[in-house]
Design a protein with these regions (language model features):
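Structural marker of alpha-solenoid helical repeat scaffolds
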Residues: 245, 279, 313, 347, ...
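Long, contiguous interaction/recruitment modules in multidomain scaffold/adaptor proteins
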Residues: 111-253
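Canonical positions in the second alpha-helix
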Residues: 241-242, 275-276, 309-310, 343-344, ...
């Protein structure tokens, strides 16, 4: 999940937060939590298309994708692979062999790329894909060879927050699960086995919402990183597709707000962030982005309240501490700003902006020696990046 809207504030830039999902490679047994068994979870490709059209009748035919729609050639290869090993009597053995084959150079030979969402045919053509892409191929093939496989959203357990230039990227995690003799057996292409205690099985249509959300993010992220024109309207369309198929998909509402902000439609942006918060009061990203808008509008009190709410949800976010500190600094509350900047640099030691403002706080308090120590730290960080 991520946000991507640089904003000018007193000569500084506030990054937006955008949300996406990335991947996990191991098989393990784990427990399941939060599954809504009252709804259908898995579909055949044909029934999936029918259900999606019913959910989103306004969707154009060319926009509809079956994320797990493996090609006949891929199915033939998978079946031949398992037939060559007649001793694979158990489902867990078959699942393990299939999972390893996807990344085996002598089999499917796929590699992992964090920013590469694509349907199975394109993933195979490229030879790489992200967590959703690789997991989708596994799930599609597993079902074709008679295994029961589902998507898993493990974002509440596996989550990465990082900064790329002016973008704060908040990445969750999609993986898979197979029903075997040992119960739920987890399929993970990134090695975070120790992180799993419980997980949430999601239905195939929610996986499609993740697919569209990821595509929108990648359009923004790749263009910004390459310093190319950003296809914001295309990204906006993908976030809207995610909401079409799952109206309660909070991440897409948040990211929709990011693009509206970039396009200068701040009212629509604020409405999108508020919708995300109403749907999920624990969505710190939407609080963060809405707070950025409030700061941009000069509503420092409103921004401070929203940053504080976001931190109640997620205390380990250095960018939230920094932005709250920036508001406190502008309000003249130097003591509170000092504490916020200290927390930011404790969480991200190379956070230059937070170090610089901490030094400014010390200077204004007459603590010159401490200010110079912080400035020296900044110089060491910069020297290490040269």
């Amino acid at each position: 999940m991520l946000f991507l809207h640089p904003e000018g504030v007193s000569g500084r830039r506030i990054s937006g937060v955008i949300t996406t999902t990335t991947l996990l490679t191991l098989l393990m047994a784990a427990g399941c939590a939060g599954t809504q068994w009252g709804q259908r979870i898995a579909y055949s490709p044909a029934s999936f298309m029918e259900a999606t059209r019913a959910q989103a009748p306004e969707m154009l035919a060319e926009d509809l994708v079956v994320p797990f729609g493996v090609t006949p050639e891929m199915v033939v290869r998978a079946k031949a692979l398992l037939e060559r090993m007649p001793l694979l009597h158990t489902n867990i053995d078959r699942a393990n062999r299939l999972m390893k084959a996807l990344t085996d150079e002598d089999e499917f030979g796929l590699t992992y790329d964090a920013v590469a969402t694509s349907p199975p045919a394109i993933t195979m053509e490229r030879g790489y894909g992200n967590c959703l892409a690789l997991t989708s191929i596994f799930i599609g093939l597993a079902r074709e060879v008679g295994l029961v496989a589902y998507y898993v959203d493990a974002s509440n357990r596996i989550n990465d927050l990082r900064r790329e230039e002016e973008i704060i990227v908040d990445s969750g995690h999609i993986a898979g699960v197979v029903m075997t003799e040992k119960g739920y057996t987890f399929v993970d292409y990134d090695g975070h086995v120790s992180e799993y205690r419980t997980f949430e099985i999601i239905d195939d249509i929610t996986a499609l919402a993740h697919y569209y959300n990821n595509l929108g993010f990648e359009m923004l992220f790749n263009a910004e990183r390459a310093e190319e024109p950003v296809p914001r309207e295309e990204a906006l369309h993908n976030f809207e597709l995610a909401i079409m198929v799952r109206p309660d998909f909070t991440r897409a509402h948040n990211n929709l707000g990011v693009v509206h902000t970039q396009l200068g439609d701040l009212d629509s942006a604020a409405a999108a962030y508020r919708t995300a918060i109403e749907m999920d009061p624990k969505t710190d990203a939407a609080y963060h982005n809405l707070a950025n808008l409030r700061m941009r509008a000069g509503d420092l009190g409103g921004a401070l309240a929203l940053y504080t709410q976001a931190l109640e949800v997620r205390r380990d976010n250095p960018y939230l501490h920094y932005h709250r500190g920036l508001v406190q600094y502008r309000l003249g509350d130097l003591g509170a700003a000092e504490e916020s900047f200290k927390r930011a640099v404790r969480l991200e030691r190379d956070y230059i902006e937070a170090h610089n403002l901490l030094a400014q706080v010390y200077y204004q308090q007459g603590r010159l020696e401490e200010a110079e120590e912080v400035k020296a730290t900044v110089q060491r960080i910069l020297a290490g990046k040269r």
